[in-house]
Amino acid sequence: MNIKEAYFKCINKMIKDEFRGYDPYDGASSSYAIIQKYYYPRLFSAYFNKFSPFNFRPIFGIRQTMQNQTIGFSGLALINYYEQHKKYIEFIADRLVESSLIDRYGYHSWDLHGFPIQMRNLLQEVGMTDIGNGIIGSFFLELYKRNPNERYKDICISVRNYFLNEFLVKNKNIIFFKYTPATQDYNWCYNASTIVAAYCVLVSKYFNINFDKDSIQKAFTDVISRQKPQGEWWYSLNMNTGYEKPQIDFHQGFILDTLLDYMECVEYNERFLNSYKKGLEFYYNKQFLPNGQSIYRYPKKYPVNIQNQAQGIITFTRAAAAGFGHHYFDFAKTIAEWTIKNMQDPGGYFYYLRYPLFTNKIQYIRWSDASMVYALAIYLNYAGLSEKAP
C-alpha cells in the first residue's frame, strides 16, 4: 500500500478503537489488588509486560485505555485533514479540556497516561512530562490556527506559563527546562529542554506575547554546547556527578526539530545553523541505513524501534521543507515505505520492535500508532497529499 493509504488505514483503526490501546509502560495498571497494593508484584508486572514479546496484559487484568498524550498526538495528525475529521478533532479537544488539571495546578496540564508507571525506585502516579504537555499544547495551537476559539488560545498560553514558571531552571550558569515539575534541578535532559523552549517561543510569537528572549536562547545554546564533535547529542547530564547518559536515538530528531522551530521563529544565526546542519548530517549518515531502517541506539543496530522510524520521517521531511535539500524528503519517503512494508500490520496498526528473526507485534497505540500517523501526516502535508482521503 502507498503512504497515504497506510496513514488512513492506521488512523481509521484508531478512530474505530476510540483511541484506546495498550502502552509499553502500563504494567502497573492491573485491576488485581495484589499488584495495586504491593511493590514487588507491581514491579514484576511492569517490567514483565514491558519486555515480553507476547501480550499477557489481559491475564494481568490490564485494560486498554485512552491516553491524553495519544489523543493529542492523534489530533495533530488529524488536523491535516481538518474538514474531513472535524468531528474527531473536536472530540479530542473537548476530552482534553475536560481532563485538564488546571484546578489542581493553576495551569492547563495533563496526566498524560491515566495510569501509574512503576520504575525500580519510583512509582509515578501522575504522568506529567513537558514533552507530553508540549504535544497537547501544540495540538491546541494548530487547532486555534484553524478555529480561533479563545478557549484554545487561553490553553496555549496557560501551558506556556506553566513551563516558564514551574519548569525553568538556572543552575551553575546553565539554563534548562526540567523533564517534569518534580525532576531535580540538577538533572538536565537535553531534548526535553529544547522541546519546552521551542513551544514557549512558538506560542509567544504567534500570540505576540513578550518573553525572556535571552533565557530561551540560552536554553538552546546550552544544549548546543553539549553537542559532540560528530554532531550527536547524548541524552542527559547529572550536573552534580557529571555523569552524561550515552543514549543516541530518536531524541536526536527531537532536538533538531526544535532547533529548526527556533530558527524559523526567531533567527537563523550562524551558531544555531551550524549545529543543526552537523546534527542533521549525523542523524542522516549514522542513525539510519540507506534502505530506511533506523539504528536502535547508535551504534547498536537492533531492535528497530518504531519511534525511531517515525521521528526520521518527521525530521527529514521538515529539513527538506526548510530548504536543506530535497534528498532529505526522498529519504523520508524511503523510511516511510520501509516502515509500512516491514512494520505495519495488515489490520493497520504499527509494530513496536523488529529484530532480525522476530517482530514484537503488540499494538501500542501511543508509542507506535500515534507517532506514526503524525509522522505520515507531516510527510503527506509537505507532499501536497493532505487534502482528502484516498
Regions found by a protein language model. Name each.
Residues 1-390:
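Glycan-recognition and catalytic cores of secretory/periplasmic carbohydrate-active enzymes
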